[in-house]
Amino acid sequence: MYQRALLFSALATAVSAQQVGTQKAEVHPALTWQKCTAAGSCTDQKGSVVIDANWRWLHSTEDTTNCYTGNEWNAELCPDNEACAKNCALDGADYSGTYGVTADGSSLKLNFVTSANVGSRLYLMEDDETYQMFNLLNNEFTFDVDVSNLPCGLNGALYFVSMDADGGLSKYPGNKAGAKYGTGYCDSQCPRDLKFINGEANVEGWKPSDNDKNAGVGGYGSCCPEMDIWEANSISTAYTPHPCDGMEQTRCDGNDCGGTYSSTRYAGTCDPDGCDFNSFRMGNESFYGPGGLVDTKSPITVVTQFVTAGGTDSGALKEIRRVYVQGGKVIGNSASNVAGVEGDSITSDFCTAQKKAFGDEDIFSKHGGLEGMGKALNKMALIVSIWDDHASSMMWLDSTYPVDADASTPGVARGTCEHGLGDPETVESQHPDASVTFSNIKFGPIGSTYKSV
């Protein structure tokens, strides 16, 4: 993800640690998805989703006193990282009432604003205490999505990260909650907005955000490889691999984390930019959007294929392909119209040429490139989210970015949204009823999850 917003609800609390509360039972909304075979038969899998611990109520283990309110910690309960983990408990979630999350069969709808809550991030579960893990190599991942109610500045995302399957429960003694309560998050931005990392609080060095009343940045970050299958609204979309030097979740320290949350963007062990394929940015301005060849006024089937050398589940990743299906018609991905950049998929050659054409620093190759991304794809957790962007107003996805750059310069124009339309204050006040719906998730060998004719 090129920029990761400081994602918090007014009830935002803690990630990857602390105790479990008893005020409300945790019941994961059921979500059915399908696993397919090479022969094309697909069988239902009875899964569920869990909301990230960062959205949950965090309170004293002794009573209902908040451990975190607004964007500040309770100094008495959280004087330091270790004490905070011992003193504070996560509690169960009211998915629809508090967070605007509703599941029905194979469909999952995420509302943007529900009362005081803004956005959400959820993980697919294999069972009540384990995230569903996927080996994407030599396979394809397919889902339907409705982005018609996602205006400028919003992002209805579906992506994979190399989280621990149990949310870090077995690794870190301070973590008593685990995947059941949505702990253990990490991504390629090495986010420092997480309240708990590796079983300890992130209170030491915490600085409340200047532009988000519910957010802040702590002394630690949480890093891991990230494969963005879908970052999109009704205007623009991108898919983006983000490799890291390590293949698993690791904790980083301060500005050495790099990414959105640190003073030096490229200081860390991950690639915060990635190698993105945004059709608009690649010169095809009519391919995706309202009334486009891929028309965002109607639901879209999105197919992403991970092609390996030798066509094996353990082969080196050599290409990430994209196919769309809409109205019964298969639509191949748009081809690059940028001079010096060829192709309609993500390959090593595409990424190298794109970085050169756009004048972007090639951090992607520095951290392993496509082959490095492939090494992480054999065990990844699935995430869906809806969010706005307090760092750059989602302009990197749907507008011209950087702000002061000439829109005619290759790579600057990413969508048709005017500057200012995506500001969080604007989207939260003008589009609180925005939403995204994901449905009909399918996973299997390449060619097994959709009909090609």
UniProtKB/Swiss-Prot annotation:
Glycans are attached at N284. PANTHER family: 1,4-BETA-D-GLUCAN CELLOBIOHYDROLASE A-RELATED, 1,4-BETA-D-GLUCAN CELLOBIOHYDROLASE B. The biological conversion of cellulose to glucose generally requires three types of hydrolytic enzymes: (1) Endoglucanases which cut internal beta-1,4-glucosidic bonds; (2) Exocellobiohydrolases that cut the disaccharide cellobiose from the non-reducing end of the cellulose polymer chain; (3) Beta-1,4-glucosidases which hydrolyze the cellobiose and other short cello-oligosaccharides to glucose. Belongs to the glycosyl hydrolase 7 (cellulase C) family. The keyword Signal applies. Its EC number is 3.2.1.91. One of its GO terms (biological process) is cellulose catabolic process. It catalyses: Hydrolysis of (1->4)-beta-D-glucosidic linkages in cellulose and cellotetraose, releasing cellobiose from the non-reducing ends of the chains. The keyword Signal applies. It is found in: Secreted. Residues 1-17 form the signal peptide. It is an enzyme of class 3 (hydrolase). It comes from the Eukaryota. Keywords: Carbohydrate metabolism, Cellulose degradation, Glycoprotein, Glycosidase, Hydrolase, Polysaccharide degradation, Secreted, Signal. The active site is at E226 (nucleophile), E231 (proton donor). This is Probable 1,4-beta-D-glucan cellobiohydrolase A. GO terms for cellular component: extracellular region. One of its GO terms (molecular function) is cellulose 1,4-beta-cellobiosidase activity.
